[in-house]
Amino acid sequence: MKQTVTSKRELEIVLLEQKRETTNQSKELLCPRQEESLIDLDSPQAQVVIGVRRSGKSTLCFQTLRNAGKTFAYVNFDDERLAGVGTAQLNDVLEVLYKVYGEFSHLFLDEIQDIEGWPLFVNRLLRQKMHVILTGSNAKLLSSDLATHLTGRSSEVSLYPFSFGEYCTMKAVDTHTMTTDKIAFRRAAFDDYALRGGFPELMHVKDGRRYVTDLVDNILRRDIEQRYHITYTAEFEALAHHLLNVSPTVVVTKDLAGTFSFKSAHTVANYIQYLKQAYLLVGVKKFSAKSKVRATQEKVYAVDVALMNQREDAYAGENLGWRLETLVLSHLIRKCKMEGWDVYYLSERYGECDFVVCCGNRVVQCIQVSYDISAYKTRKRELNGLMLAAKRTGCDDLLLLTDHHYEDMDDRGRTIKIRPVYEWTLEDE
């Protein structure tokens, strides 16, 4: 077992090893990410990249720095040898970094959220005109510290696992040529993506189930249980796996409290918030003019389909509709982050619509997702949900996403586009 560093010499050994690791990484085939354009390396603000573990945050920052030709130093605090580093030692870290790297204009601090006193340290660096890049895997810890100590001095970028377009780039799949063979290759790639998910390292590991199981366990124990001092860990983990198994699902905290023997619905609500802050789950609020409804009737999704199908004892592997809906949300949250839009779901007694996309108070698109609409009842139900959404919102941009169907149709005076999900996700690439 590696020991926590206690001297500058030991710190230098750790940082030299980390430097060698990043040098080796620079030789690997990397995928361009859309989020690279959102990182402003010339800004006086700290650039903060947050997202689920293993989504490629560090790689994105390395790519951005290297592509821009910046001189930078790097320290990864997600290293057990640096677990004891606190406020008093952060200046020692900076001193050793200058020794290891020489002069540098940018400082990349990876997974810094658990280091005591880091916001004050970063604030001092910014006052000294150092350009700082941060990554972290917990939205609350980063955001609360930033709000307290770095108000107006940080810019946040959210990163998610690979989109289907990025997956195709890494697999060298042609996403544009409209020939029979190229379309078939894209179709096959999407089937694989829908099963394996978008975590970058999953493309290179043989045992995907073991990888994802370990990833989820790591997030639950290190990013949540240890940080929030959760006592009943078995019950908490059972709740987390249940929500991943049944996602997408509308959260009813009172029912979950009874099922998992928690003392109150408030405890369940807190636990679900922790899961969202660690980016295991993504919440979608109900479309309503009433704030109370939006705040209480939330629908949760796994942040990536790998968390649904690739874990040991996963339940959702064969539920194709759930997987497709989750893939659509994964694409929507990326797109909406870029556009500054919000996503809701609509549910009433007379029907449902999976996604209502809003720009401020204006609804820009209503989207329904169904794996297969060949059955008359299924097709009618999905179209009725879209028509209900159109009536409630006044939106005329209506989209029905399926696994393979392509059609433009009129229904009750409105035009509905029916598209395969894999084609739709590539439109923005």
Predicted feature descriptions by range:
Residues H131-S137, S158:
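Structural recognition of the conserved hydrophobic beta-strand(s) that form the central parallel beta-sheet
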Residues K2-Q3, H204-V363:
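Accessory nucleic acid-recognition modules appended to NTPase machines
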Residues A73-E103:
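Short glycine-rich substrate-engagement loop in P-loop NTPases that contacts/grips substrate
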Residues N24-L41:
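Pre-Walker A adenine-sensing motif
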Residues V49:
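Hydrophobic anchor at the beta1->P-loop junction of P-loop NTPases
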Residues S58:
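Walker A/P-loop
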Residues K2-T22, D145-V250, K276:
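Interdomain motor-coupling "hinge/lid" segment immediately C-terminal to the ATP-binding subdomain
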Residues D403-E429:
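Domain-level recognition of nuclease-like catalytic cores that cleave nucleotide substrates
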